[in-house]
Amino acid sequence: MIMNTRPIIGITMGDPAGNGPEITVKALAHKELYENCRPIVIGDAKILEQAVRFVGRPDIRIHRCETVGDGLFTYGTVDVLHLELIPDVESFPIGEVSVAGGNAAFQCVKKVIQLALANEVDATCTNALNKEAMNRALEFYKGEYSDGHTHFDGHTEIYAAYTNTEKYTMMLAHHDLRVVHISTHVSLREACDRVKKERVLEVIEIADKACKDMGIENPKVAVAGLNPHCGENGLFGTEEIKPAIEMAKARGIQAIGPIPPDSVFSEALGGWYDIVVCMYHDQGHIPLKTVGFVYDRELQEWKAVEGVNVTLGLPIIRTSVDHGTGFALAGT
């Protein structure tokens, strides 16, 4: 890792048609951030200059960099490792799915992974990309700019592919609630089929290690059930969750469950568990976003959109926002 008291954080700009560039400018407008790290945005400098105008911050200057070493890392200046992705920013459609936007977002992710693997940045943080736009681009260019890849389910799978990682999972966190997933971006039918003993054990082990890496000693790993009431003690359901839990216990992990999904998250919020292993995407996303996303009924707008996405199991650090591209909000 790079030896410095302030780590270098590579931040992707996200889909240029979304609100990622604007969110980035707003985030980097906080002076205290520069006291803790050295951020550098990976993207098209012209898009970030446009974002500065959108958010009304003429006091912020965009500094184009050819290498990470060119960064000034000074408050009031946003360093951008420039990639020429959108030739004509003025004619680029904001708030729409496009091949150009999808390709731009993908190239930023690919580049930041390369930088992390080369130890040029200490950690990575990704803004949202639009999966439809990205996959349109991958298919349109027939893998020419993606090392032959013509489809990715999302960020997690891109990181796994470009770091040659086989065992990984997504963790969402909001204060004391942490959730990890057996599967993510697949249909519910397929998600049920993926609940296998080997995969459940794998994710329990990843979750246990992640908690220990975060400084939690002897973490309590809750494992959610799949069927209502966890199958009523065997009356129905044939998933292999319980055997995986027993195997994890035999390996010294404090795994607990299976626990009914309608109560495990409240218990985790109350401090009973340090992390919850969820059987599929929405089982983990819904409770976390229920506590992290707050909608103001009177103002008819989001009051808070909080949560951090972390990919576990990678050889590099990857964090992300826990929301989408916000096409409807871009440029406003």
Which role fits each region the language model picked out?
Residues 159-168, 173-177, 312-328:
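Short, flexible loop segments at boundaries between secondary-structure elements
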